[in-house]
Amino acid sequence: MSWRSESIWIEFRTGSRKTSNFFWAFILFLGSLGFLLVGTSSYLGRNVISLFPSQQIIFFPQGIVMSFYGIAGLFISCYLWCTILWNVGSGYDLFDRKEGIVRIFRWGFPGKSRRIFLRFLMKDIQSIRIEVKEGISARRVLYMEIRGQGAIPLIRTDENFTTREIEQKAAELAYFLRVPIEVF
């Protein structure tokens, strides 16, 4: 989603609150909870959950391994739910031609650097760079090349844009900022 006028362009970034993250966090939670319950059932020697007969699973080694996988899965699921709750990676890119300033803001993990805020002058922007790697794991990234700071990614690699959409976005942004486009 974006908002645009003659002198200001704002691009909003979604972050980690995406449908796929909700889906995987939920599936991982249920799967790891199932593993932990089966491991606990094999330890106790009775069915905690009636779907799986635990008498067929011996605690050592199968029950221990299933309990370990269940605990590990719960930790990973907790991590995913925390990133969704904190909305890590969301923010905005603001390009202001009137003031000649670019502001990039992203939410990070809680702590000292929770708010990631970059600010620099438009005259320091050297180019807009497109990096395209085709193949099995295709990767299309849009960067902004800044004098003295290197390349700053503007579009995340997990956003599934086609090559045409990336080129269109790069062309619009380069036209707005009045800088050249580089393709790698």
Curated annotation (Swiss-Prot):
The answer to whether UniProt assigns keyword Chloroplast to this entry is yes
GO BP, one example? photosynthesis
UniProt entry keywords in alphabetical sequence: Chloroplast, Membrane, Photosynthesis, Plastid, Thylakoid, Transmembrane, Transmembrane helix
The portions of this protein that span the membrane are 22-42, 57-77
Classify the protein's membrane topology as the record does: Multi-pass membrane protein
As for subcellular location, the record says: Plastid, Chloroplast thylakoid membrane
Main subcellular location of this protein, as a coarse class = plastid
GO CC terms for this protein? chloroplast thylakoid membrane; photosystem I
Q: Does the record's keyword annotation contain Transmembrane?
A: yes
The entry's function note states: Seems to be required for the assembly of the photosystem I complex.
Which family, according to UniProt?
Belongs to the Ycf4 family.
The protein's name in its UniProt record: Photosystem I assembly protein Ycf4
Instruction: Give the source species.
Output: Aethionema grandiflorum
Its gene is ycf4
